[in-house]
Amino acid sequence: MNYDFSRELRLLTPEDYKFVFKQAHRAGSPHFTILARENSLSHPRLGLAVPKKQIKTAVGRNKFKRIVRESFRNKQHSLPAKDFVVIAKKSAQELSNEDFNKLLDKLWHRLSRPSRG
């Protein structure tokens, strides 16, 4: 199995993001929200939204993105064929890396279950 985070595993265009925002299933926490929507591909894709307004420093924004990408990269083979967008909130920078990863795992699992609607 390949665990890289190649270009095909990313949401690249504004249209990709709009597609997810239009009719997304949400899984949230006080620290970040993950939106998910089925895609027509055979693999999941990830997009990140980390506003300067929420996480002020570039170091904080980069850390958030690095942790989310790493978690996605390791979970990609167990995730369904959906497009995911992770949106940061202010309190995300207060989490330790360990707590951050536990919370991400919980939300990935929640969004991996078949939807009821």
Curated annotation (Swiss-Prot):
It holds the Pfam family Ribonuclease_P. It is an enzyme of class 3 (hydrolase). InterPro entries: Ribosomal_Su5_D2-typ_SF, Ribsml_uS5_D2-typ_fold_subgr, RNase_P, RNase_P_CS. It comes from the Bacteria. One of its GO terms (cellular component) is ribonuclease P complex. GO terms for biological process: tRNA 5'-leader removal. It catalyses: Endonucleolytic cleavage of RNA, removing 5'-extranucleotides from tRNA precursor. GO terms for molecular function: 3'-tRNA processing endoribonuclease activity; ribonuclease P activity; tRNA binding. Keywords: Endonuclease, Hydrolase, Nuclease, RNA-binding, tRNA processing. Its EC number is 3.1.26.5. RNaseP catalyzes the removal of the 5'-leader sequence from pre-tRNA to produce the mature 5'-terminus. It can also cleave other RNA substrates such as 4.5S RNA. The protein component plays an auxiliary but essential role in vivo by binding to the 5'-leader sequence and broadening the substrate specificity of the ribozyme. Consists of a catalytic RNA component (M1 or rnpB) and a protein subunit. PANTHER family: RIBONUCLEASE P PROTEIN COMPONENT. Belongs to the RnpA family. HAMAP family: RNase_P. This is Ribonuclease P protein component. The gene is rnpA.
